[in-house]
């Protein structure tokens, strides 16, 4: 899990929970003590650039790191997508709908970034985010 690269190996941190509606099951996601690559750690600053097109898992990573007070978010409010979608057939028709089937629940805020997106710490247009950072 990418968030683990921006934490220390110990103590383990409860990063996120994902509620799967189809299974009626909540899975807790914790930081990982060992990683395949080099850990960035917590001693260096971390800035994440966002736009209105930042969507899905990218939003989850930004929201988790923001609420861990590990990253500063610079740019625009994100799209407010979802972590998992499923395509379902409507009755005996040729129509399908795509619906969210899982929900991210942050252990710090008790809330999700879905629908409303992730609000930046520094609100600037996406094209100005790198300069603002």
Model region roles, listed by residue range:
Residues 1-45, 49, 53, 83-91, ...:
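Gly/Ser/Thr-rich loop/hinge elements
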Residues 3, 43-46, 58-62, 66, ...:
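Extracytoplasmic/secreted envelope proteins and their assembly/folding machinery
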Residues 8-15, 66-75:
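Bacterial peptidoglycan biogenesis and beta-lactam-recognition machinery
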Residues 60, 108-113:
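Short conserved micro-motifs at the rims of enzyme active sites and ligand-binding pockets
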Residues 111-133:
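Low-complexity, Gly/Ser/Thr/Pro-rich intrinsically disordered linker/tail segments
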Residues 24, 40, 52-59, 124-131:
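Soluble non-cytosolic domains of exported or imported proteins
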Residues 66-70, 91, 101, 112, ...:
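Active-site-adjacent betaalpha module
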Residues 53-55, 68-82:
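Short, well-structured beta-strand/strand-turn elements
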């Amino acid at each position: 899990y990418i968030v683990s690269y921006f934490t220390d190996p110990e103590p383990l941190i409860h990063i996120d929970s994902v509620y799967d509606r189809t299974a009626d099951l909540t899975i807790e996601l914790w930081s990982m003590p060992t990683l395949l690559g080099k850990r960035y750690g917590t001693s260096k600053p971390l800035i994440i650039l966002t736009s209105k097109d930042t969507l899905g898992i990218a939003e989850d990573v930004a929201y988790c790191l923001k609420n861990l007070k590990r990253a500063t978010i610079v740019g625009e409010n994100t799209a407010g997508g979802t972590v998992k979608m499923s395509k379902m057939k409507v009755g005996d028709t040729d129509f399908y709908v795509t619906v969210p089937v899982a929900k991210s629940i942050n252990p710090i805020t008790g809330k999700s970034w879905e629908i409303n997106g992730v609000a930046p710490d520094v609100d600037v247009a996406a094209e100005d985010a790198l300069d603002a950072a």
